[in-house]
Amino acid sequence: LIGLVGSEMCIRDRIEEFTDNMLSNDDYRQYLGNALPKLYLGWNNSFRYKNFDLSFQMTGQFGFKILNEPRAYYENNSIAYNRLKSVQKAPYGGQYTLSTAQKQTFVSYYLEDGDFLKMTNITLGYNIPLKSSKFVKNIRAYVSADNLFCITGYDGLDPEMSNSDIWSLGIDWRDKYPSTRSFTFGLNVSF
């Protein structure tokens, strides 16, 4: 059983008894990591050369753990449909068959490093040279990409998570869609 104490993840090997709705034996609790990143990284830069301009923004977070709940759910061998192929890797020492009472959700096997580095935006533009014009001052054509790539060892959809819910820090629930990658082609005209 795993539990959150602030932003720290703890695990218990067994539950001996319940007393006043609290687990009474803390002897088996182990520190497994922190749900909050130790380091946040942000970097943006822009370059200009003649009529070309290039700008980018990168973000990253390092030194934290994520509980991969979608993987735990879809690797649960007690359901007979919609399972991941990786269920055959047997996180419980060769035990392949689970009953519906055996949950894989909150076990340390699904706790992963959440470190990542993302290219959140990159834009390449070209200012089209104009001969003197009364009406148009500038024309710039550009191409832009958002969420171009993410370098991570995390097996889930996206290691970048919201830290707004204190009770869910570091847990990647099954309630989100993958981040959208978008490409934009544009033309700026100044009059």
Question: Residue spans of the language-model regions?
Answer:
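Membrane-interface anchoring segments and C-terminal beta-barrel signals
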Residues: 46, 67-69, 79, 88-191
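Repeated loop/turn-to-beta-strand initiation elements of outer-membrane beta-barrel proteins
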Residues: 51-54, 131-132
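Short, well-structured alpha-helical interface segments that form or flank functional binding sites
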Residues: 36-40, 47, 119
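Short alpha-helical segments and helix-capping/turn motifs at coil-helix boundaries
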Residues: 38-41, 126-128
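Surface-exposed, extracytoplasmic segments of Gram-negative outer-membrane nutrient-acquisition systems
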Residues: 7-8, 12-36, 44, 53-115
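Extracellular interaction modules
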Residues: 1-6
